[in-house]
């Protein structure tokens, strides 16, 4: 299980991304539409002035149950360990053990 502080840090980042999403998108759109290089530089400075954690690339996908950052399946939002345990316990509908 991941430390609670790390899970809390990721939740905080998600909230910052939601808070600054519209501002960030509007600045990026203005950068694309800017014609002069000086105007682009000024807009880029505005973008850099936003908090670092407000960028969506800073968010890390984590397992909902354990908080594990690696081997997380997007379809379930769970790590491979939890998926295996839940599949063996018949808690995931439609998931069957493969055999060939």
Swiss-Prot record:
Q: Recall the GO molecular function terms of this protein's record.
A: rRNA binding; structural constituent of ribosome
According to the UniProt record, which cysteines are disulfide-bonded?
Answer: none
Q: Does the keyword Transport apply?
A: no
**GO biological process, alphabetically ordered:** translation
- Could you tell me where this protein is found in the cell? Plastid, Chloroplast
Could you tell me which Gene3D superfamilies the record lists for this protein? Answer: 1.10.287.1480
> Tell me, how does this one assemble?
Part of the 30S ribosomal subunit.
Family the UniProt entry places it in: Belongs to the universal ribosomal protein uS14 family.
Name of the molecule in the record: Small ribosomal subunit protein uS14c
Q: Which organism is it from?
A: Chaetosphaeridium globosum
Its lineage reads: Eukaryota, Viridiplantae, Streptophyta, Coleochaetophyceae, Coleochaetales
């Amino acid at each position: 299980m991941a430390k609670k502080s790390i899970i809390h840090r990721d939740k905080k980042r998600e909230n910052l991304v939601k808070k600054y999403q519209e501002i960030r998108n509007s600045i990026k759109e203005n950068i694309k539409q800017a014609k002069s290089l000086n105007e682009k530089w000024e807009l880029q400075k505005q973008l850099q002035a936003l908090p670092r954690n407000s960028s969506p690339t800073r968010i890390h996908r984590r397992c909902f149950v354990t908080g594990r950052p690696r081997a997380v399946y997007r379809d379930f939002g769970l790590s491979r360990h939890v998926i295996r345990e839940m599949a063996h316990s018949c808690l995931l509908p439609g998931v069957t053990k493969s055999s060939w």
